[in-house]
């Protein structure tokens, strides 16, 4: 990065980005209060300090922005917080494909004319579980700005934190031990999803 900034003005990039992936990786693996994450945060801080000192020494009119793409929340494999979707997926086979990432699940209809039928089936499956919400794409909360893109599922299944959807509890628990971290919940209801934004 410093070498780019030292280039002649005509060759110097006008916009440069960096991403420290090791902070996110540690948070996912061991949670937000782990010693591993603290060590990675310290490393990120040291690297950022080197960059900031280098920018200061260059004496160029450079604006620095420090941000994150999301926050993170601690999770456990506590019984009752894991929601199994295998029987729902089997029930919808032939009607829809389900792409599940834990916090939310995208349902893509094979026949758009079956939207209401499939929507009602999903609503019925989660009836009585107040921690799961089911939306038609066009009825998602406006504040999400998540209605118009063609890649968004026809129906969305959303969980409250710290509830988590998995196809098979056995397969999921085999890969999850102790505390781990995740993100993807609604930041309006889960403040841990908020990120930083500093500019100077």
Predicted region positions:
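Acidic/histidine-rich catalytic neighborhood
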Residues: 61-64, 70-110
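Short, solvent-exposed loop/turn and secondary-structure capping segments
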Residues: 28-31, 76-79, 168-170
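Active-site neighborhoods of enzymes that stabilize oxyanions during catalysis
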Residues: 96-200
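Beta-strand elements within well-structured catalytic alpha/beta cores of enzymes
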Residues: 13-21, 37-44, 48-51, 62-71, ...
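Short, solvent-exposed loop/turn segments at secondary-structure junctions
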Residues: 22-25, 71-73, 161-164
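A long, amphipathic alpha-helix that forms part
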Residues: 2-9, 23-64, 182
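Secretory-pathway/luminal and periplasmic proteins that interact with or process carbohydrate-rich
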Residues: 25-27, 72-77, 131-133
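Feature for exported/extracytoplasmic and membrane-associated proteins, marking the mature portion
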Residues: 1-14, 121-124
């Amino acid at each position: 990065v410093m070498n780019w900034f030292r280039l002649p003005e005509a060759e110097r990039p006008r916009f440069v980005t960096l991403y420290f992936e090791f902070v996110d990786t540690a948070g996912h693996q061991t949670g937000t209060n782990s010693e591993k994450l603290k060590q990675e945060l310290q490393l990120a801080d040291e690297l950022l300090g080197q960059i900031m000192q280098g920018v200061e020494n260059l004496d160029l009119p450079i604006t620095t922005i420090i941000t994150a793409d999301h926050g993170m929340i601690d999770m456990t494999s506590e019984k009752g917080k894991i929601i199994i979707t295998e029987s729902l997926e089997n029930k919808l086979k032939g009607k829809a494909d389900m792409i599940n990432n834990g916090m939310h699940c995208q349902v893509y209809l094979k026949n758009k004319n079956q939207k209401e039928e499939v929507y009602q089936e999903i609503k019925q499956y989660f009836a009585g579980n107040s921690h799961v919400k089911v939306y038609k794409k066009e009825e998602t909360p406006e504040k999400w700005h998540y209605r118009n893109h063609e890649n968004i599922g026809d129906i969305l299944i959303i969980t409250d934190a710290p509830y988590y959807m998995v196809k098979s509890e056995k397969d999921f628990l085999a890969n999850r031990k102790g505390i781990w971290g995740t993100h993807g919940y609604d930041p309006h209801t889960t403040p841990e999803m908020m990120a930083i934004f500093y500019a100077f």
